């Protein structure tokens, strides 16, 4: 069982925007906290691949994946770094029909990535567990894709009303990875998600090539996201993320491990923490230590 962490956990949206610690500093902290692998962001891949390789070698880390819209440029870089997957971190879809559209798009991306030995995955939040025509949107997506994998964010799945071990077993050999995120409450998927065809729909990642933006513009974007997260609704979204193994946790991590072990390959685990109950690095170190002591 590989226990990794995403660079997203070191700054959240600020990390997407290339603000805060350098990539090497993040790698050093990740190593010191006890993790052995890392999931990158698009902005991380704006560094020269040879520099990233050097920093990985210096810290003893390996790359598993990147959270990015899968383009051939991104896929090539992930292959050069020895990674396993490019994970689409989310895109709007609100119905069975739109889920099928996304499934076909992901299959096209997967066909592009196959020659490079890279898998294409989709990462969920809670809204993908909205029901339409008898199934959740994420089930419609996977049922209509033959090449796409799931990176099941177990925290958002449980939060949205889906029992992760059930989902993993239903889609055996389709779970390339999981995001480890604690949860203490089932909230549900919310109202019908946004349509990908509404005005201002998907136009590519808002975080693509962010280093080309002036620092002031990036800070303005961050301030907007920070205001959303500090709103009453934003705080409510993350307050359900408790300490790993806490009494209030409603996620059965041991059963998740059993379900994953039934696959024909090893899925990689990525810690992604957005809610902090204590000092930032202590929470992440606790996550890593708890997994190693209780799950491996």
Question: What residue spans do the PLM features occupy?
Answer:
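Acidic-and-aromatic substrate-binding clefts and catalytic sites of carbohydrate-active enzymes
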Residues: 13-18, 37-50, 67-74, 93-100, ...
């Amino acid at each position: 069982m590989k226990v990794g962490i995403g660079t997203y956990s070191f700054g959240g949206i600020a990390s997407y925007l290339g603000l805060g610690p350098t990539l090497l500093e993040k790698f050093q902290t990740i190593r010191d906290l006890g993790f052995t692998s890392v999931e990158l962001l698009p902005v991380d891949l704006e560094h020269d691949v040879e520099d990233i390789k050097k920093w990985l070698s210096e810290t003893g880390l390996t790359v598993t994946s990147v959270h990015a819209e899968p383009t051939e440029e991104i896929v090539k870089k992930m292959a050069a770094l020895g990674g396993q997957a490019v994970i689409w971190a989310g895109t709007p879809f609100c119905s069975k029909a739109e889920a099928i559209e996304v499934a076909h798009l992901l299959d096209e991306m997967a066909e592009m990535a196959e020659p490079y030995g890279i898998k294409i995955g989709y990462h969920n939040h809670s809204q993908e567990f909205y029901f339409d025509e008898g199934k959740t949107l994420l089930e419609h997506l996977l049922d209509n894709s033959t090449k796409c994998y799931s990176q099941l964010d177990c925290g958002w799945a449980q939060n949205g009303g889906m029992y992760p071990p059930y989902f993993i077993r239903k889609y055996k050999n389709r779970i390339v990875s999981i995001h480890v995120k604690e949860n203490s409450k089932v909230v549900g998927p919310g109202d019908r998600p946004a349509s990908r065809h509404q005005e201002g729909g998907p136009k590519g990642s808002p975080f693509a090539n962010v280093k080309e933006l002036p620092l002031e513009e990036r800070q303005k974007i961050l301030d907007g996201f920070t205001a959303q997260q500090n709103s009453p609704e934003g705080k409510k979204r993350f307050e359900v993320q408790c300490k790993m193994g806490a009494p209030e946790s409603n996620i059965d991590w041991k059963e998740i491990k059993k379900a994953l072990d039934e696959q024909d390959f090893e899925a990689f685990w990525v810690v992604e923490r957005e809610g902090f109950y204590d000092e930032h690095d202590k929470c992440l170190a606790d996550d890593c230590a708890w997994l190693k002591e209780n799950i491996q």
